[in-house]
């Protein structure tokens, strides 16, 4: 990106996959969701995850590490914010179809079975906890090419 943008060009991104993306009050949802998904995976698909090593996509950087990474590539950060967003079930169901998320969450499992299990587990967790949304922090960053 730094080689593509001319000096003064803007680079903007956001992510909820950073250290700090999960709020303490949402941890129960994540635990229930993953527990239920793993159970569904075993019962309905006869599969289990292969937890040999943490998948690279699951290694979250801190907001400061993202900043350092951007600055190391000849950018000046002009805006860095963390916004809390209330994510409804549709957001979690959508992410349950995203390959990088699936591979990071249920490593070694065929994508279709993993996605199915994640979606069913999400429905069960939302229902059991009587949720309409789960709060999630998003890191927003805007940087200018030096």
Predicted regions, residues:
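C-terminal helical/coil "lid" or tail adjacent to the Rossmann-like core of SAM-dependent
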Residues: 79-132
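A short glycine-rich, Lys/Arg-flanked "PGG" loop and its adjoining helix->strand segment in the class I
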Residues: 1-10
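Conserved class I S-adenosyl-L-methionine
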Residues: 10-42
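Core SAM-dependent methyltransferase catalytic element
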Residues: 74-75, 96, 135-146
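Short alpha-helix
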Residues: 57-74
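A structural signal for well-ordered alpha-helical scaffolds and beta->alpha junctions
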Residues: 59-63, 115, 119, 136
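Active-site capping/gating segments
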Residues: 36-58
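Ligand-binding pocket scaffold of soluble enzyme catalytic domains
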Residues: 13, 130, 136
């Amino acid at each position: 990106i730094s080689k593509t943008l001319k000096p003064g060009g803007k680079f903007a991104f956001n992510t909820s996959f950073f250290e700090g993306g999960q709020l303490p009050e949402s941890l129960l949802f994540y635990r229930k969701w993953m527990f239920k998904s793993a159970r569904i995976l075993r019962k309905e698909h006869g599969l289990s995850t292969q937890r040999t090593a943490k998948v690279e996509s699951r290694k979250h950087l801190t907001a400061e590490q993202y900043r350092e990474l951007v600055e190391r590539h000849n950018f000046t950060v002009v805006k860095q914010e963390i916004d809390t967003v209330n994510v409804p079930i549709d957001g979690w169901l959508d992410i349950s179809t995203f390959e990088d998320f699936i591979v990071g969450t249920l490593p070694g499992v065929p994508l279709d079975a993993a996605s199915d299990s994640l979606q069913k587990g999400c429905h069960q967790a939302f229902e059991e906890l009587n949720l309409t949304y789960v709060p999630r922090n998003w890191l927003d960053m805007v940087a200018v090419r030096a």
